[in-house]
Amino acid sequence: MLSIIQRVNCANVVVDNQKVADINKGILALVCVEKEDTQQNFEKMADKIIKYRIFEDDAGKMNLSLADIDAEIILVPQFTLAADTKKGNRPSFSSGCPPEIAKEKFKEFENIFRRKYNKVQTGIFGADMKVSLTNDGPVTFSFKI
């Protein structure tokens, strides 16, 4: 399981000219499930994202988590994170899940995340999404579980 999280001042996702997710201060997380991912991977990734301290405290130190500041998050499914880019000039997606399995796994991850945290919005799996954000920092981290 892969994720790239970005601390944002605001972010939104638009599908077919309809805004499907819209947050103010919080996290935009690009999420990729892989073939071997299990519920345990989803639990660990959710905990990592929710508890990771990327927001500044009063002293200006990155010492507060999403949960600490009660901010919002958008989970955006993004299979391209699984691309193998080592060879040639065209990405390979051999480690990715078939779309129908990936969709189920992403939904399972979303459900686990929602059980742990209540300010969650999502993009739409398989849709052509327009993702906009104002990155705060920029502060961006990459996770592999």
Swiss-Prot record:
Subcellular location field: Cytoplasm
Pfam families, alphabetized: Tyr_Deacylase (PF02580)
Keyword Transcription regulation: no
Reaction(s) this enzyme catalyzes, per UniProt: glycyl-tRNA(Ala) + H2O = tRNA(Ala) + glycine + H(+); a D-aminoacyl-tRNA + H2O = a tRNA + a D-alpha-amino acid + H(+)
Single Gene Ontology MF annotation: D-tyrosyl-tRNA(Tyr) deacylase activity
Motif Gly-cisPro motif, important for rejection of L-amino acids, residue numbers: 137-138
GO cellular component, one term: cytoplasm
Source domain of life: Bacteria
EC number(s) on file: 3.1.1.96
RNA-binding keyword on record: yes
Main location: cytoplasm
Biological process, per Gene Ontology: D-amino acid catabolic process
Keywords: Cytoplasm, Hydrolase, RNA-binding, tRNA-binding
Function according to Swiss-Prot or TrEMBL: An aminoacyl-tRNA editing enzyme that deacylates mischarged D-aminoacyl-tRNAs. Also deacylates mischarged glycyl-tRNA(Ala), protecting cells against glycine mischarging by AlaRS. Acts via tRNA-based rather than protein-based catalysis; rejects L-amino acids rather than detecting D-amino acids in the active site. By recycling D-aminoacyl-tRNA to D-amino acids and free tRNA molecules, this enzyme counteracts the toxicity associated with the formation of D-aminoacyl-tRNA entities in vivo and helps enforce protein L-homochirality.
HAMAP family: Deacylase_Dtd (MF_00518)
Subunit structure: Homodimer.
Domain notes for this protein: A Gly-cisPro motif from one monomer fits into the active site of the other monomer to allow specific chiral rejection of L-amino acids.
Family the entry assigns: Belongs to the DTD family.
The protein, known as: D-aminoacyl-tRNA deacylase
Taxonomic source organism: Francisella tularensis subsp. novicida (strain U112)
Lineage of the organism: Bacteria, Pseudomonadati, Pseudomonadota, Gammaproteobacteria, Thiotrichales
Gene: dtd
